[in-house]
């Protein structure tokens, strides 16, 4: 199965709507996409959780795959969890060894692990993608 990972970087324009495969987006997609087009929005940081909580960002139209820090956010903000629980496709809390940089505290590994890295890891390990395209 092919999985496309769409980030917000300079090369996101290379992604064409209707491209074969399932689509994972990093946080907020760089273009308007429907729920039907997006398999899930992947989020890993407190910054996105805070933006969703305050209402400055709306991703309620998508399913979510959330990392370690969003999971911790939900544990400390139960009202937020209840409000958005229907959006949560799942939590992906695996942090690979390469995210643990030499000389950094072990707790820093999840911080070093970006949304794009998590989306690719999720595509390969959970979705069992045989082909992953990054945009």
Model segments located where?
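Acidic/Gly/His-enriched mid-domain segments of enzyme catalytic cores or analogous surface patches
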Residues: 10, 17-131
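Extreme N-terminal starter segment of soluble prokaryotic enzymes
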Residues: 1-3
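Histidine/lysine/aspartate-rich catalytic loop segments that bind and position anionic ligands
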Residues: 135
């Amino acid at each position: 199965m092919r999985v496309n990972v769409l980030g917000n970087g300079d090369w996101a324009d290379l992604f064409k709507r209707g491209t074969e495969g399932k689509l994972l987006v990093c946080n907020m997609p760089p273009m308007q996409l429907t729920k039907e087009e997006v398999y899930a929005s992947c989020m890993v940081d407190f910054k996105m959780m805070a933006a969703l909580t305050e209402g400055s960002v709306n991703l309620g139209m998508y399913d979510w795959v959330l990392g370690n820090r969003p999971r911790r956010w939900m544990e400390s903000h139960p009202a937020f969890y209840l409000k958005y629980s229907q959006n949560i496709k799942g939590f992906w809390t695996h942090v690979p060894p390469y995210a643990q940089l030499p000389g950094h505290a072990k707790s820093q590994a999840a911080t070093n692990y970006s949304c794009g890295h998590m989306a690719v890891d999720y595509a390969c390990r959970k979705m069992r993608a045989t082909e992953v395209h990054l945009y």
